[in-house]
Amino acid sequence: MNSVVPEDYVGYTEVTREAYDPEKAKELLAEAGYPDGFEVTFDAPNDRYMNDEQIAQAVAGYLEKVGIKVNLNLMPKANFFSYIKPLENKSMFLMTGWSDASGDGLSLMHDMLYTYDREAGNGGVNRGHYSNAQVDALIDQAFTEMDDTKRGELVAEADKIAREDYAYIPLHFEQDTYAIKDTLNYTPRMNKYVYAWEFSYK
């Protein structure tokens, strides 16, 4: 996973994932004024996503290797989502997931990366309080673009800027397993929805 926009969604673009380079990370920390690292609280659920506790522990381990002390704050989903729901409550660092049934990356961009504005209904799950006027402008423009290809280009550009800002760190897409009778044709959907009319006999 290199982006929040899944393959086959409008706005998906192939992105080269950055190589794991702890020495470079240490250099960047030193350049930023943290030669000895710093301390961070990492909020994550432990029963919502597939292997979420193990993933959070792995992320914490990678951060520890470059000198960032991680206080891992794991909690059940019943507590986690109420804990992070008020966007005024600024988690330092958190792990969450998001999905979208539209097949269009624009919805993901608007919900996750648009500057949060409760009254306007923008950035509803922008839990990192990311704000970039250029990203907002591209998303606004994409909402008025009816051509899928052109809209996809706007979404991809907004995502590129957000990734370069490190607005988020993509980890993975959950993989689903389906058991299907060998007399049927079916291609699973990215949004995990299952519709009977999408099955056909061979």
What are these regions (language model features)?
Residues 28-35, 62-69, 83-87, 112-115, ...:
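Structured segments of extracytoplasmic/periplasmic soluble domains
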Residues 2, 32-49, 91-97, 102, ...:
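Bilobed periplasmic-binding protein-like "clamshell/Venus-flytrap" ligand-binding domains
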Residues 25, 80, 151:
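Acidic, amphipathic alpha-helical patches
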Residues 42, 62-117, 154:
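Periplasmic binding protein-like
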Residues 54, 60, 64-73, 185-187, ...:
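C-terminal amphipathic alpha-helical "assembly" element
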